[in-house]
Amino acid sequence: MRLPTVLIGRYIPVDSIVHRLDPRAKLLGMIFLISAVLIVPNLLFYLVPGLAIFLLMFLSRTGFKIYLAGLRSLWFFLVFAVLVQFFSSSEGEKIFWMITDRAIWSAVYIMLRLVLIILLAENFSATTPPLLSARAIESIFSTFGARKIGHEIGMVMTIAMRFVPVLALEADRILKAQIARGANFERGKFFDRIRALVVIIVPLLISALRKAEELAVAMEARLYTGEPPKTRFKDIKWKPMDTLYVLLTAGVLVLVLFGRYFVDGVFQYGS
């Protein structure tokens, strides 16, 4: 048994156009694209944000296999979301048992939305160092006069994202240790295998609490108070390419909005 790869929270250093973009531009672009994905009116218009996201993945030069591995790590979450959609709607014509045609379309839409949002989040974390992500959040909040709040939110999000791959590696280490002691996670019934995972979950929670305490002590020892720094070792500079990127992603959102409010839906179940 081997745990799947977790990409969210991992930065992949590659020299690409996407890596060289200003982190503020990438954050704004991600917000625009996620908004576009959430308000898509029909299946046809999923091509608009979908192609934009796949173009970002291609230009980032990190490889499509990495993104697929990241999706595999979240398969249980995706399947659960689809099953919830299957049984959450009783409207429409029944196809099988309690499942209706409207529920099937809802499941298709929620699956597409989740996959595209996950791919976009993976692309952002793979092309943006965690510290620059925090800088981007702080800078955007500073524009509205809330620099301290932006700094705190950025720091919390950075630490949370950095903990994802750390905990994934820790879970893999615990899994190998339990297998070496004779534990078997691949035999038995489904619920038996779920119960067997307790020997991984409990040590993982203890390890997570220990690492969080160590991080808190380290930050306190370095006199971290939560106040944003007055100076920076290296400033981030906005370039014309960043403006172009933000305009293009905003254009994707505008196009989807146009399709939602001015174009008749191809499949009405998605509206």
Curated annotation (Swiss-Prot):
The keyword Membrane applies. The chain crosses the membrane at residues 38-58, 66-86, 104-124, 149-169, 197-217, 243-263. One of its GO terms (cellular component) is plasma membrane. It is a multi-pass membrane protein. It is found in: Cell inner membrane. InterPro entries: ABC/ECF_trnsptr_transmembrane (IPR003339). Keywords: Cell inner membrane, Cell membrane, Membrane, Transmembrane, Transmembrane helix, Transport. It comes from the Bacteria. Pfam families: CbiQ. GO terms for molecular function: riboflavin transmembrane transporter activity. Forms a stable energy-coupling factor (ECF) transporter complex composed of 2 membrane-embedded substrate-binding proteins (S component, RibU, BioY), 2 ATP-binding proteins (A component) and 2 transmembrane proteins (T component) upon coexpression in E.coli. A stable subcomplex with both A and T components are also isolated. This complex interacts with at least 2 substrate-specific components, BioY and RibU. Transmembrane (T) component of an energy-coupling factor (ECF) ABC-transporter complex. Unlike classic ABC transporters this ECF transporter provides the energy necessary to transport a number of different substrates. Expression of the complex plus RibU in E.coli allows riboflavin uptake; uptake does not occur in the absence of RibU or the EcfA1A2T complex. Belongs to the energy-coupling factor EcfT family. This is Energy-coupling factor transporter transmembrane protein EcfT. It comes from Thermotoga maritima (strain ATCC 43589 / DSM 3109 / JCM 10099 / NBRC 100826 / MSB8).
